[in-house]
Amino acid sequence: MKELIKDPLNLIIIGVAGQGNVVTSQLVCDALVREGYLVTFGQSYPAQQRGGSVINYIRISKEIQCSPIIPEGRADVIVAMEPVEAIRMLAQFGNPDVITMVNPRPIQAIDITGSKAKYPGLNKVMEDIKDLSAKTWVINATEEAQELGNAIMANVILVGALVGCGLLPLERKSLEPVIEERFPRAFELNMAAFDRGVELAREQE
């Protein structure tokens, strides 16, 4: 069995509503529990966004049951399905050792869309993410999912990438039953998305 890179491991998964980040979190949690890990899951909703995004907190350990909310400045891994959301999480939960995985497809959340503020330049956002992270994995999950036939599978691609780069102590066989239960009529397609995520992560090693 693979080992945690840190115990407990504090993982944050964030995205704009509709990107499937809650499903991403559920797949990760279910697979970890099946492998015998103690997993605590929590959520919060940024007030300024009025439903624009949801923060998913996942705390993983072999030894202890953690509280559901990750303290500020204590994230070990941040997975952002949208670049500006990565910056927000790094500002609040980042530290010199934090690892970030980001899908570089920008989506304007409610607070940006509803105001006069423009979405910041993507190149600058990506540079800032790298500057604020000890290690950054850029996974073009939306683009790859579209090539597979459905952009919503970006969430499964990111799960595959987390496994592929070794940030989660899981293997393909850990996710197969979880993905089959969640997507029984699209199991093979979602496993293809998972496998593509693994490949994308390993290409950056």
Q: What feature does the model see in each segment?
A:
Residues M1-E205:
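Active-site cofactor/cluster-binding pocket
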